[in-house]
Curated annotation (Swiss-Prot):
Major localisation: mitochondrion
Keywords for this protein: Lipid transport, Membrane, Mitochondrion, Receptor, Transmembrane, Transmembrane helix, Transport
Organism (species): Bos taurus (Bovine)
Purpose: Promotes the transport of cholesterol across mitochondrial membranes and may play a role in lipid metabolism, but its precise physiological role is controversial. It is apparently not required for steroid hormone biosynthesis. Can bind protoporphyrin IX and may play a role in the transport of porphyrins and heme. Was initially identified as peripheral-type benzodiazepine receptor; can also bind isoquinoline carboxamides.
Top-level taxon in the UniProt lineage: Eukaryota
CDD domains for this protein: TSPO_MBR
Gene3D superfamilies: TspO/MBR protein (1.20.1260.100)
Protein known as: Translocator protein
Protein topology in the membrane: Multi-pass membrane protein
Cellular component annotations (GO), alphabetically ordered: membrane; mitochondrial membrane
Mitochondrial intermembrane topological domain residue ranges: 1-5, 68-79, 127-134
Length: 169
């Protein structure tokens, strides 16, 4: 049997795995494309994003461990709170390929809005089980709102129009 700390570490690190894989889209050609975009003055510097995401991913991961532990593992009672969490995490991981990989800022915004909705539903479900676990999602919800505003602004500011028609992003 695994030591009791193994699930806590695993749950805490899991979100960062997808974040690390998604970060691969921000390198090379994806980074050059992103650097060429118009950005609002309130755009965060690139160097701060990894610490922010690392903190948010660790907090949500540990919160998921708290829910898992409180509900006795992957029990029937855990299906909704952990299912919502898994859904929002999958949507979160889909954003970098959409934004940087396909350069579809509009679809990336749709993904962010869905992620925010699922994350809010996750926080509400977690609150029923463990209010402290739900509190670990609040900074993430705030960051998703900020990221959504930034994504929207960049999408709007970088659309090319000819003859009243939008070109593909």
């Amino acid at each position: 049997m695994a030591p009791p700390w193994v699930p806590a570490v695993g749950f805490t690190l899991l979100p960062s795995l997808g974040g690390f894989l998604g970060a691969q889209y921000t390198r090379g050609e994806g980074f050059r494309w992103y650097a060429s975009l118009q950005k609002p003055p309130w755009h965060p510097p690139r160097w701060i994003l990894a610490p922010i995401w690392g903190t948010l991913y660790s907090a949500m991961g540990y919160g998921s461990y708290m829910i898992w532990k409180e509900l006795g593992g992957f029990s029937k009672e855990a299906v909704v709170p952990l299912g919502l969490y898994a859904g929002q995490l999958a949507l979160n991981w889909a954003w970098p390929p959409l934004f940087f990989g396909t350069r579809q800022m509009g679809w990336a915004l749709v993904d962010l809005l869905l992620t925010g909705g699922m994350a809010a539903a996750t926080a509400m479900a977690w609150h029923q089980v463990s209010p402290p676990a739900a509190c670990l999602l609040y900074p993430y919800l705030a960051w998703l709102a900020f990221a959504g505003m930034l994504n929207y602004r960049m999408w709007q500011d970088n659309q090319v129009r000819r003859s009243g028609r939008r070109l593909s992003e």
